[in-house]
UniProtKB/Swiss-Prot annotation:
Belongs to the class-II aminoacyl-tRNA synthetase family. Keywords: Aminoacyl-tRNA synthetase, ATP-binding, Cytoplasm, Ligase, Nucleotide-binding, Protein biosynthesis. GO terms for biological process: asparaginyl-tRNA aminoacylation. This is Asparagine--tRNA ligase. GO terms for cellular component: cytoplasm. The keyword Ligase applies. The gene is asnS. PANTHER family: ASPARAGINE--TRNA LIGASE, MITOCHONDRIAL-RELATED, ASPARTYL/LYSYL-TRNA SYNTHETASE. Gene3D superfamilies: Bira Bifunctional Protein, Domain 2, Nucleic acid-binding proteins. It comes from the Bacteria. It is an enzyme of class 6 (ligase).
Amino acid sequence: MTKIASIADVLQGEIAVGEKVTVRGWVRTRRDSKAGLSFLTVYDGSCFNPIQAIINNDIVNYESEVLRLTAGCSVIVTGTVVESPAQGQAVELQTETVEVVGWVEDPDTYPMAAKRHSIEYLREVAHLRPRTNIIGAVARVRHCLAQAIHRFFHEQGFYWVATPLITASDTEGAGEMFRVSTLDLENLPRTQAGTVDFNQDFFGKEAFLTVSGQLNGETYACALSKIYTFGPTFRAENSNTTRHLAEFWMVEPEIAFATLADNAKLAEDMLKYVFNAVLTERRDDLEFFSKHVDKDVITRLEHFVNSPFAQIDYTDAIDVLVKSGKKFEFPVSWGIDLSSEHERYLAEEHFKSPVVVKNYPKGIKAFYMRLNDDGKTVAAMDVLAPGIGEIIGGSQREERLDVLDKRMVEMGLKPEDYWWYRDLRKYGTVPHSGFGLGFERLIVYVTGVQNIRDVIPFPRSPRNANF
């Protein structure tokens, strides 16, 4: 029986020249020669490059089917692997049979016809866009990065924890959350005071989609020592920018008995590990991005993995920015949250390497970050990368109950709403640290694709929840 193989296996030499093989996939192009030959390029998504199938006009269905094949038709091709005289490919298939599995019913209206489409147009046909070179390459890189993240944490002795998507707490204290409710919007139950009676809702109280798995993750870190979460998170932020999604994935490790320095080391090790993985495993896709999207993709990643991370205190970073003589759009002064232009100046022009900025003013950071001895700053950190700015945000968590309570009250939160989170500090508290990595932001950095909506299969953003 003829072996069925992926196109990746054939092109990478897993199937020997002279061996008979069957590949299954979709037609990218067909061209016919006057000499009675047809050349099909067939892809199956297993790698960037398609395979070329040479078809003689003496096969049974040549006139009836092969000459009618158009982009998008699905086929099963059986033939012998032969060395290719053509440039850019080592082997091709000398075809014996072509079975047409599915036709494109009307080639003239097929949205993925064989021409280059704008990335904006592809968002309108998100169900078909993985058939294109660019989105297919993004999907493979996304998979590679996800697998590398899981592998890294497993090798480091971390446990993966599934944190809930439905929650009653706001991790960031930002309030931009999607409500989860089964109440009849046409007939909302009311309390005597006239407010919505959430006691009659599914959970008996207000519930939301999570903005972060961090608080839940901390509970497991304070029992299993090293954990990470990796899952979807949601922000009801009305931002129509190239950097924002309403639904995105987050990687959030938490480590017990860890300081901010341990946290920064973990972030550096993880990023270098996953970038090395993608440079090794998805070179073909990165070469495509380098050629057609961002010429610096490969050199940027190689520079990143070979650069020691710089470290600087926020206060010193402000000093560097003030003394730079550069005119920034957003003025620089102590107490501001660094904007993208500030972050990129530090990483790209000042340090020319990834940099960890740490010890931020407490007023611009979340309640759970550990208050430093100066009483003005917290043990927070951001990892800034050349080419994008902030890629990771994290902190040492506040392990002292009295300080945590005070911070909550300062920020207008009710400590009683976080009773279970406070329990971690009451029963065997430990210093612990963690960070958050926006997964799609990581993919943007690796691929050079500029819009975050193009690195997630079905983007969710204001007024857009199609498919």
